[in-house]
Curated annotation (Swiss-Prot):
Keywords annotated in UniProt: Amino-acid transport, Cell inner membrane, Cell membrane, Membrane, Transmembrane, Transmembrane helix, Transport
Organism field: Corynebacterium efficiens (strain DSM 44549 / YS-314 / AJ 12310 / JCM 11189 / NBRC 100395)
Molecular function GO terms recorded: amino acid transmembrane transporter activity
UniProt xrefs under Pfam families: LysE
Main subcellular location of this protein, as a coarse class: membrane
Membrane-spanning residues: 3-23, 37-57, 66-86, 139-159, 172-192, 208-228
Name listed for the protein in its UniProt record: Lysine exporter LysE
Localization: Cell inner membrane
Keyword Membrane annotated: yes
Assigned protein family: Belongs to the LysE/ArgO transporter (TC 2.A.75) family.
GO cellular component, one term: plasma membrane
Function: Catalyzes the efflux of L-lysine.
Length: 228
């Protein structure tokens, strides 16, 4: 149980560092578009990555340690690029998020008498207008996960590397704990953002979110640089 909890805490600490994947989950939650598909992609990707990390950390470290250095520098470039994009969006100060809301009948007094007429609340614009609105967010989640060098660093260096010290059985318990953190985190963030979509869709709020993301990503990039 102690090994499981240790993996859970490490997984949570990695998730708390807001990266491009988490930003996508938040944005799609606010838009209420394809959030379930995005969450499923994130969870399935973590299963595969954590499994690969647990299986392959020793092999990579022993046979091709330069691969980890390449991943580290690619990760630095990736983080800094997204930090610049977030800072740019914050400076533009015009980020607006459109979310979906179903129209509801509203009773209103009729001007001609005591009757009641039915008005429709304005329907907020739906960005896609197709039933397959989840496809693009799902593809974005795949790209931001599998083309993110830091995902491999997390899997091989942190999950695989730290878990290896617990032995053959313990490392899988450790990886299960790390995945449990993902299992809680992504639905909580995605559906939580959907529940708070109205206040979070404000341009002022997103300006500060983008500033925070830029600062955090820059800090993570500096941390990776210092690891060398």
């Amino acid at each position: 149980m102690e090994i499981f909890v240790t993996g859970l805490l490490l997984g949570a600490s990695l998730l708390l560092a807001i990266g491009p994947q988490n930003v996508l989950v938040i944005k799609q939650g606010i838009k209420r578009e394809g959030i379930t598909a995005v969450i499923i992609v994130c969870l399935l990707s973590d299963v595969v990555l954590f499994t690969l990390g647990t299986l392959g950390v020793g092999l990579i470290s022993d046979t091709a340690p330069i691969i980890l250095d390449i991943l580290r520098w690619c990760g630095i470039a990736y983080l800094l690029w997204f930090a610049v994009m977030a800072a740019r969006d914050a400076l533009r100060a015009r980020t607006e998020v459109t979310f979906v809301e179903h129209s509801e009948p509203v009773a209103a007094a009729s001007a001609s008498g005591g009757g009641v007429t039915t008005k429709q609340r304005p329907r907020l614009r739906i960005t896609s207008g197709t039933r397959q609105v989840w496809v693009r967010p799902m593809l974005m989640a795949i790209v931001l996960t599998w083309l993110n060098p830091n995902a491999y660093l997390d899997a091989f260096v942190f999950i695989g590397g730290v878990g290896a010290q617990y032995g053959e059985t313990g490392r899988w318990i450790f990886a299960a704990g790390a995945f449990a953190a993902s299992l809680v985190w992504f639905p909580l963030v995605g559906y939580g953002a959907a529940a708070l979509s109205r206040p979070l869709s404000s341009p002022r709020v997103w300006r500060w979110i983008n500033i925070g993301v830029a600062v955090v990503l820059t800090g993570l990039a500096v941390k990776l640089i210092l690891m060398g």
